[in-house]
From Swiss-Prot:
Subunit annotation: Monomer.
Zinc finger boundaries on the chain: FPG-type: 257-293
Keywords assigned: DNA damage, DNA repair, DNA-binding, Glycosidase, Hydrolase, Lyase, Metal-binding, Multifunctional enzyme, Zinc, Zinc-finger
SUPFAM superfamilies: Glucocorticoid receptor-like (DNA-binding domain), N-terminal domain of MutM-like DNA repair proteins, S13-like H2TH domain
EC number: 3.2.2.23, 4.2.99.18
Name by which UniProt lists this protein: Formamidopyrimidine-DNA glycosylase
Alphabetical list of InterPro entries matching this protein: DNA_glyclase/AP_lyase_DNA-bd, Formamido-pyr_DNA_Glyclase, FPG_cat, MutM-like_N-ter, Ribosomal_uS13-like_H2TH, Znf_DNA_glyclase/AP_lyase, Znf_FPG/IleRS
Swiss-Prot/TrEMBL GO biological process terms: base-excision repair
HAMAP family, per the entry: Fapy_DNA_glycosyl
Length: 293
């Protein structure tokens, strides 16, 4: 499933062709994706200017001139591509390049610029939903989300408060979207490695008895910032080989320090450890037992 860097890459890829442009017409080529489309889905989009394209955690939000907001989620296999008027196709860069077959093109936005924006989703775990601008805070998919990890409010003190007293593992706490929004398995493994913290460590150890952030919390927040920013600059992570027609995006997997590197040497200078894998809460965890404590 796409994590924050992949969704942010999508947003940046779509922003130039969506923001300020009008959705002349929209097509929903089937009745549902993960959820059924609203009966008036196409009608509410037709003729609307996209005032802005934002992101909240792993969701995209298109702010429409009508006061509505188009909420979009990529699911497991969703991707956008932009077909320009001169028929040059460019990706709205989420890099699991499955499903370019047009049979999986389920939604198309025909923009006033002449470009078409196509949503392709072979597994149909993605969804689109129109809500009122005033409903964002109460929308079930958004209302319980924690702070953005790249936002100003996310710091060591905030993370310590969120984890104080928690008896769950540090990795499980970071994957809890109520604690921090947008992190997933890949970037949690990578951030914990860079902070030299064990995924098995109790989340409560990020806070002192008085609730103040420990050095562990400070290192972890810095590592989260670093990993996410590096991944965004690389266009996210692609776990399958592919090439994009507009350049090399989605190559952060070449910078993985532990993820998907089971049995390989640890990349920490001076560490003679080996990357291990174990299953934690139903997900693969990759770490170096020697330098992550």
């Amino acid at each position: 499933m796409p994590e924050l860097p992949e969704v942010e890459t999508v947003r940046r890829g779509l922003q130039p062709v969506m923001e300020g442009a009008k959705i002349v017409t929209a097509e929903a080529r089937r009745g549902d994706l993960r959820f059924p489309f609203q009966p008036d889905f196409v009608k509410r989009l037709q003729g609307q200017t996209v005032r802005g394209l934002g992101r909240r955690a792993k969701y995209l939000l298109a702010d429409l001139g009508s006061g509505d907001v188009l909420l979009m989620h990529l699911g497991m296999s969703g991707s956008f591509r932009v077909i320009k008027p001169e028929h040059e196709e460019t990706p709205g860069e989420f890099h699991y390049p499955r499903g370019k077959d047009s049979v999986h093109d389920h939604v198309v936005f025909h923009m006033s610029s002449g470009a078409d924006i196509v949503f392709n989703d072979p597994r149909r775990f993605g969804f689109m939903k129109i809500i009122g601008r005033g409903e964002i805070e109460t929308e079930p998919h958004l209302k319980d989300l924690g702070p953005e990890p790249l936002g100003n409010e996310f710091d060591a003190a905030m993370l310590a408060r969120a984890c104080a007293g928690k008896k769950t593992s540090l990795k499980a706490a970071l994957l809890d979207q109520r604690v921090v929004a947008g992190l997933g398995n890949i970037y949690v493994c990578e951030a914990l490695f860079r902070a030299h913290l064990s995924p098995r460590r109790l989340a409560a150890t990020l806070a002192t008895r008085k609730g103040e952030p420990t050095d562990h919390a400070k290192r972890l927040v810095e590592a989260i910032h670093t990993v996410l920013n590096e991944a965004i600059r690389a266009g996210g992570s692609s776990l399958r080989d592919h090439r994009q027609t507009t350049g090399e995006l989605g190559y952060f997997q070449h910078s993985f320090q532990v993820y998907d590197r089971e049995g390989e040497p640890c990349r920490t200078d001076g560490c003679e450890g080996v990357v291990k894998r174990f299953v934690q809460n139903g997900r693969s965890t990759f770490w170096c037992p020697k330098c992550q404590r």
